[in-house]
Amino acid sequence: MSFLKSFPPPGPAEGLLRQQPDTEAVLNGKGLGTGTLYIAESRLSWLDGSGLGFSLEYPTISLHALSRDRSDCLGEHLYVMVNAKFEEESKEPVADEEEEDSDDDVEPITEFRFVPSDKSALEAMFTAMCECQALHPDPEDEDSDDYDGEEYDVEAHEQGQGDIPTFYTYEEGLSHLTAEGQATQERLEGMLSQSVSCQYNMAGVRTEDLIRDYEDGMEVDTTPTVAGQFEDADVDH
């Protein structure tokens, strides 16, 4: 395939953790041949015997896992899903943000499978992948976890220093939502109203019917028991 190119394999300077020879590479079900898989901290690379191969950047890798399905014709292998599209006519993988002419919003996905001849090496390959992937966290996940607002210094405010942070009321907050956020808000409100009006069943009988029958047809004597009321009852000794 034309996207295969010649490049030097990653070495110790790039944090090479695992070098697995005799590994078959499969792209979207199409075999690329047998070569060497290089799992480095900087990138994931595969090169065949002629020196042609490809590299995957960790930020584009959305999933990696071990496939233990022996019924698969490939057998046990390392599975890697990439958020990029590899095309025969292109020299480089086309990332999602570069597909401006796409007619839909479907994110491109490419599946790689690496099948080593030595199946006992799969665990070490997977562990090396986990370690390298952890060095390249998703920026979107980091942004969602971090609070990007200004810190509110209570002590400074009490001394008349610093600005009061801006808060939105519920209505004002809705006006700042994006179209997607507003759609999500409406969907959540619909789910909430549906759950409130939902009638729960108990042994096939609606609980509200039980409560109504209980209130209409059953009287409960709330008169407190007087001490000594049953003192004249027979008691077996």
Swiss-Prot record:
Q: What Gene3D superfamilies has UniProt attached to this entry?
A: Pleckstrin-homology domain (PH domain)/Phosphotyrosine-binding domain (PTB)
| Superkingdom per UniProt | Eukaryota
Entry keyword set: Acetylation, Cytoplasm, Cytoskeleton, mRNA processing, mRNA splicing, Nucleus, Phosphoprotein
Q: What is the lineage of its organism?
A: Eukaryota, Metazoa, Chordata, Craniata, Vertebrata
The record's InterPro entries line, in alphabetical order, gives: ICln, ICln/Lot5/Saf5, PH-like_dom_sf
Q: What is its main location?
A: cytoplasm
Q: Provide the assembly information.
A: Component of the methylosome, a 20S complex containing at least PRMT5/SKB1, WDR77/MEP50 and CLNS1A/pICln. May mediate SNRPD1 and SNRPD3 methylation. Forms a 6S pICln-Sm complex composed of CLNS1A/pICln, SNRPD1, SNRPD2, SNRPE, SNRPF and SNRPG; ring-like structure where CLNS1A/pICln mimics additional Sm proteins and which is unable to assemble into the core snRNP. Interacts with LSM10 and LSM11.
Q: Name one GO cellular component term.
A: cytosol
Positions bearing Phosphoserine: S102, S144, S193, S195
**Residues annotated with Phosphothreonine modification:** T223
The name of this protein is Methylosome subunit pICln
Q: Fetch the Pfam families from UniProt.
A: Voldacs (PF03517)
Described by its record, this protein's role is as follows: Involved in both the assembly of spliceosomal snRNPs and the methylation of Sm proteins. Chaperone that regulates the assembly of spliceosomal U1, U2, U4 and U5 small nuclear ribonucleoproteins (snRNPs), the building blocks of the spliceosome, and thereby plays an important role in the splicing of cellular pre-mRNAs. Most spliceosomal snRNPs contain a common set of Sm proteins SNRPB, SNRPD1, SNRPD2, SNRPD3, SNRPE, SNRPF and SNRPG that assemble in a heptameric protein ring on the Sm site of the small nuclear RNA to form the core snRNP (Sm core).
Write out the GO biological process terms: cell volume homeostasis; chloride transport; mRNA cis splicing, via spliceosome; spliceosomal snRNP assembly
Sites of N-acetylserine modification: S2
Say which family it is in.
Belongs to the pICln (TC 1.A.47) family.
